[in-house]
A protein has these predicted regions:
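Well-ordered beta-strand positions in beta-sheet-rich domains
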Residues: 20-23, 86, 128-132
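Charged, cofactor-coupling segments
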Residues: 93, 100-135
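A residue-level detector for conformationally permissive "hinge/kink" positions
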Residues: 29, 45, 53, 85, ...
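Short secondary-structure boundary micro-motifs
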Residues: 5-7, 24, 40-41, 77-78, ...
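Short, small-residue-biased leader/transition segments that mark boundaries at the very start
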Residues: 1-2
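N-terminal leader/targeting segments
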Residues: 5-16
């Protein structure tokens, strides 16, 4: 069972982001991600994805989340995993394999508010994100 957190949802600041990081996904990323044990045909079978209303198979949510995490780790932690305490966010749109995910970050001390977008389609794919970084 999944329960939503009682914490207030972080809001994206109304100013330009402090940092931006673009990371491209591989066209075959959804097929590779099946190694995690998620065999949902939504991520691998075009006909199944079309019946679900998508133009093609979509990337796993965990993969989208991990790309945003990679951007945070690279940009805010200098790839020092010991500085990366936690992250959370809300999925808001699918990502298609091969798309570039842009993570925009607003830094306030140890707290980083972020969102991830796919600029080519003009959509936000992960919104109201919050990460805690150890200074």
């Amino acid at each position: 069972m999944l329960f939503r957190s009682q914490k207030p949802t972080p809001k994206i600041p109304e100013r330009a982001p402090d940092k931006i990081c673009d990371i491209a996904t591989l066209p075959q990323a959804a097929l590779i991600y099946r190694l995690s044990g998620d065999y949902n045909p939504l991520h691998s079978e075009p006909a199944y994805a079309a019946r679900a209303g998508f133009k093609q198979p979509i990337l796993h949510g965990r993969a989208t989340f991990s790309v945003a995490g990679h951007a945070l780790l690279k940009t805010c932690c200098g790839y020092d995993a010991a500085k990366f305490k936690s992250m959370e966010g809300r999925f808001s749109s699918p990502v298609y394999p091969g798309e570039t995910i842009r993570t925009e970050m607003w830094i306030d001390g140890a707290m980083v508010t972020f969102r991830a977008t796919v600029p080519a389609r003009g959509v936000t794919v992960l919104n109201n994100g919050m990460a805690e970084i150890i200074q």
